[in-house]
A protein has these predicted regions:
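Long, charged, low-complexity, helical-prone intrinsically disordered regions
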Residues: 1-167
Length: 167
């Protein structure tokens, strides 16, 4: 589910291993010491950062290329992501991979919030394009948008707004 990650990111994601245990698990599964067709074999890969800075080293399943070839094209829809989506949990990873600085602000005092209490990231294809603060009004059986922010470089075109409305 992570695609490519460091041993520390694996430990944090699964929350079952210490970083040292994860590092030892990874060492035992590097493809040079295991058959490449073993589903737990790992390879070392370089991953490009969203900002174009130097690539960072990560680990991936040895069958990564085969997995990538089988992936469907990203959906054309605009997706509203849960703030608790696994890809959003690690803020530094999120920033590095997507150039998206995200923080759920439910525990931040209202006066110190940058966006809002419960803001949802917006995903278009492979890019995080904005954030939306919305809630359900049960009395009207409606979804109420309190605020919408597009990321830098994203044009809030009529087509984009229609795509969001359809979601």
């Amino acid at each position: 589910r992570l695609g490519a990650a460091s041993s520390a990111e694996l430990a944090a994601f699964f929350a079952l291993l210490t970083p040292l245990e994860a590092r030892n698990w990874v060492k035992a599964r590097i493809a040079t010491s295991m058959p490449r067709d073993d589903s737990t074999a790992l390879i070392e890969v370089d991953v490009e950062s969203a900002d174009g800075s130097r690539p960072f080293s990560a680990l991936a399943r040895a069958d990564l290329l085969e997995q990538l070839e089988q992936l469907p094209a990203p959906p054309k829809r605009l997706r509203v992501l849960s703030p608790f989506d696994p890809v959003l949990r690690d803020r530094s990873r999120m920033q590095r991979l997507f150039g998206f600085d995200y923080r759920i602000e439910i525990f931040v005092p209202a006066a110190q919030r940058k966006y809002g209490y419960y803001v949802f990231p917006l995903l278009a294809g492979e890019r995080l394009v904005g954030r939306i603060d919305m809630h359900r009004d049960r009395s009207r059986d409606a979804l109420v948008v309190k605020a919408l922010w597009w990321e830098a470089g994203i044009r809030p075109s009529k087509a984009r707004r229609q795509t969001l409305q359809a979601e």
